[in-house]
Each structure stands twice: as structure tokens, then as C-alpha cells.
Amino acid sequence: MFIGRHYRKKRALSLLAVRTTQKARKLLIVMWTPPRNDQQYLNWQWYSSVLSSHAAMCGCPDAVAHFNHLASVLRAPQNPPPPGPQRNLPLRRLPALPAAPEAPGDRAPWPMAGGAEGEEGGAGGDADHGGAAGGPEDADLLDAVAAAET
């Protein structure tokens, strides 16, 4: 009787018949956390995986030099060549806009015009514009602002 080798043929085992126990399910549910998919975390994970794979191959701390060497040896695509001299497009004047199709009498008078022709226009209302400082209320307000600043 030779026991060194198994004489049974190996056959495929379907894992559908293998069921997890209730205890294993509870443990998996407790240990599960939602994935952390923010960009900074993903970048850090990729960076650490690259450094770990480099450390498995080589003991030096310079993974970037090895990537550059592999890129040159394996003829990786290089950066695109710099563009040639930029061609300046000729500047030209734009044509003038066409005149408005309305007649001059169609518009309402300008609100600051001051009234009918012959009257003094441009005053902008009925206020007295003689004094620069305004009325007594404005003087009190200016005094209060000056006192607050000092």
C-alpha cells in the first residue's frame, strides 16, 4: 500500500453549497465600514502601494528614479513636443452697428431733464442744491460720524 500520493482524482468543488455560519455573518456585519472614497485618501493609498511594491523589488529609497529609468527603457510615451511659433491672427475692426430703426420722437423724455424746453434742466429734482453740506440733519449726522472716528 503506497500512501505517498492520493489516488483520487481531484474534482471541482462548488462553493455554492458551502454556507457561512450565523456567527461569521454577525462578525462580518460588525466589522464592515463604508468605504472612504475621498480623493486625498485614494491618492495616499495609491502612493503607499507604489512605495511598497518598489520596496519589495529594491531597497533604495528612490522610486521615482526607477520609474524614469523604466520609462526610458520601455519607450514609454514622452511629453508632447513644445508647440511651434504661435501664429498671430490679424486684427481687424468690427463694422459699426446699424442705427436704431425708431424715430427720435418715440422716446420718453429723460427723467433728469427738468421739464419742458426753456426751463432749467439737469437739476435732477426739486431739491435745493445750493449748500454742499445739506440741511441741519446732515450736519448732525456728520458731527456724529466725526465723533465716532476720534
UniProtKB/Swiss-Prot annotation:
Region ranges (Disordered): 75-150
Protein name: Uncharacterized ORF2 protein
Biased composition regions of type Low complexity, renumbered to the chain: 86-103
Taxonomy of the source species: Viruses, Viruses incertae sedis, Anelloviridae, Torque teno virus
Originating species: Torque teno virus (isolate Human/Ghana/GH1/1996)
Family annotation (Pfam families): TT_ORF2-like
Matching InterPro entries: HEV_TT_vir_Orf2/Gyrovir_Vp2_N
